[in-house]
């Protein structure tokens, strides 16, 4: 009897060990990302390149951070604007052609017509609900701006007048993403709800969280799909972002890990997710299997944002002036 119990203990121990091994994501053999030195230790929040010169890029961040690159993001220089207070929080930048926009707090709106050679500060009304957090350039003189309470405004005259696109704001939000057709997914400040806006509805539709864990961030994927990151390193997917129906949340990798903060599709199937403690994971098949860039966990920074400007051009932004550039597998030294 004692021998039988000992045998069962060994079997259970082996099974438990296999479960632990399965829970660990494999390490990426080649990490196609390289860190770029930037002349700041501030948090980097958004990146954009001009529509007239794809090598001419801009970075924005907290503490009035404004950086410029002329070589596609390899090297960056500080740009100082006297119109900005030292503690200005620049959260979003967007270009359409040579025309660009920057928004931030407190009530910051910057505008350029010449790729950023000159920036003009545009005064925003004190009646504006909330603070600007997102800007999208749409064409000559046209842009769409969103505030941190879900108010959406559009201009067609270079920012002189703005017209409301939504009937009522939704209250404090912590993250928002814009879809290719002008749709928005917004996460409530507490992560208990998310909201969907479509241009034809002119209103926000609320959806409660389906998981016991609060929602951290959301974004759009290819062909009408979307992803959702929950606290506790959970990921869920939907093939139709208008349906309100999501897959069962999964937790790639270890049971204990840093939280996931943002995600981006490189193409229709390659998905990258970033998070705290230098976390970067990759799925080559839309979320079925995963691998981890463990070597990047040595970078002492949280990764807040990831964005691709085409399948071969991507950037990761984070705290302490952290910037990574996608270099591809053939150019990676790892």
From Swiss-Prot:
Pfam families (UniProt xref): PSII_BNR (PF14870)
InterPro entries: PSII_CF48-like_dom, WD40/YVTN_repeat-like_dom_sf, Ycf48/Hcf136
Keywords: Photosynthesis, Photosystem II, Signal, Thylakoid
Gene3D superfamilies: YVTN repeat-like/Quinoprotein amine dehydrogenase
Signal peptide segment: 1-22
Domain of life: Bacteria
GO BP, sorted A to Z: photosynthesis
Subcellular location: Cellular thylakoid lumen
A GO CC term assigned to this protein in UniProt: photosystem II
Cited function: A factor required for optimal assembly of photosystem II (PSII), acting in the early stages of PSII assembly. Also plays a role in replacement of photodamaged D1 (psbA). Assists YidC in synthesis of chlorophyll-binding proteins.
Family assignment from sequence similarity: Belongs to the Ycf48 family.
Domain remark from Swiss-Prot or TrEMBL: A 7-bladed beta-propeller torus, about 55 by 55 Angstroms, with a depth of about 25 Angstroms and a central pore.
Subunit structure of this chain's protein: Part of early PSII assembly complexes which includes D1 (psbA) and PsbI; not found in mature PSII. Binds to the lumenal side of PSII complexes. Interacts with YidC.
The protein's name in its UniProt record: Photosystem II assembly protein Ycf48
Organism: Synechococcus sp. (strain JA-3-3Ab)
Gene: ycf48
